[in-house]
Amino acid sequence: MAPSPTKRRERSEDKPRERGKEKAPAKEGAEKERGRDKIRKRRSNSTGSSSSRSSSSSSSSSGSSSGSSSGSSSSSGSSRSGSSSSSRSSSSSGSSGSPSPSRRRHDNRRRSRSKSKSQKRTDEKERKRRSPSPKPTKLYLGRLTRNVTKDHIQEIFATYGKIKMIDMPSDRLHPNVSKGYAYVEYESPEDAQKALKHMDGGQIDGQEITATAILAQRIRPAPRRLSPPRRMPPPPPMWRRTPPRMRRRSRSPRRRSPVRRRSRSRSPGRRRHRSRSSSNSSR
């Protein structure tokens, strides 16, 4: 006999009920275990941070549904990465915004050095503009022969201008012979330039000479030497010291009584004289 369709329906309805009854105690046991886990975690993490609380909530939600746990983990990872990136960006911005004191000092030194160099250059340029370099009025003549004298140089170089001074050092051993060079100083720099153009490489006494311009040295006053302070002579040693002035004064000499001379009679002297003369005559 085939079962009736009504019985089949009843059986099919009874099966899901039984399955629901079986699932209900399993769900209750799982919920109890979850509650116990939550209590334990709360006790252990009573002094924990907000991060531990969020992790406990995420773990409880992950037990209920795997999809929600994966979403929370991804969101927490993204939040961590975002916080780390924000902290890095803030640190980099802080470091870039406020440089270290050593860098500041280095930058200040560079700026001061560059300023000092630029100031020096400008000062030098201003000095050059204010005081132009003086033109030379003195010439150095080299490679002169020993036959050339002061008078020869005077005759030759006086044609180019008025000569102020001629210096021709002579040899020590031979005072009438020059050392082979001389100095000629003109009153105006134009005359000196003219003589330099014509006589540099010219010939005197059959020999080619050299002429070069020289700036005349300014005679500077010699610096005054401060006389050293006079030092008192050191005191003589104790054994050489003279007595004080009071002792130097010689006391008035004591009056001594005149020595009494013994009065002698002249007779004994005469006798002696006579005796001596008599003795001499007898001899």
UniProtKB/Swiss-Prot annotation:
Compositionally skewed regions (Basic residues) per UniProt: 102-119, 242-276
From the Swiss-Prot or TrEMBL record, state where the protein is found. Nucleus; Nucleus speckle; Cytoplasm
What is the protein name stated in its UniProt record? Answer: RNA-binding protein with serine-rich domain 1
Family stated for the protein in its record = Belongs to the splicing factor SR family.
The Gene Ontology CC terms held by the record are: ASAP complex; cytoplasm; nuclear speck; nucleoplasm
Broad class of the protein's primary localization: nucleus
Q: Which gene encodes it?
A: rnps1
Record's subunit section: Component of the active spliceosome.
Keywords, ordered alphabetically:
Cytoplasm, mRNA processing, mRNA splicing, Nucleus, RNA-binding
Could you tell me which InterPro entries the record lists for this protein? Nucleotide-bd_a/b_plait_sf, RBD_domain_sf, RNPS1_RRM, RRM_dom, RRM_dom_euk
Per the record, the GO terms for biological process are: mRNA splicing, via spliceosome
Which portions of the sequence form the region Disordered?
1-141, 217-283
Species name: Danio rerio
What does this gene product do? Component of a splicing-dependent multiprotein exon junction complex (EJC) deposited at splice junction on mRNAs. The EJC is a dynamic structure consisting of a few core proteins and several more peripheral nuclear and cytoplasmic associated factors that join the complex only transiently either during EJC assembly or during subsequent mRNA metabolism. Putative component of the spliceosome which enhances the formation of the ATP-dependent A complex of the spliceosome. May participate in mRNA 3'-end cleavage. Also mediates increase of mRNA abundance and translational efficiency.
Top-level taxon of the source organism:
Eukaryota
GO molecular function terms here?
RNA binding
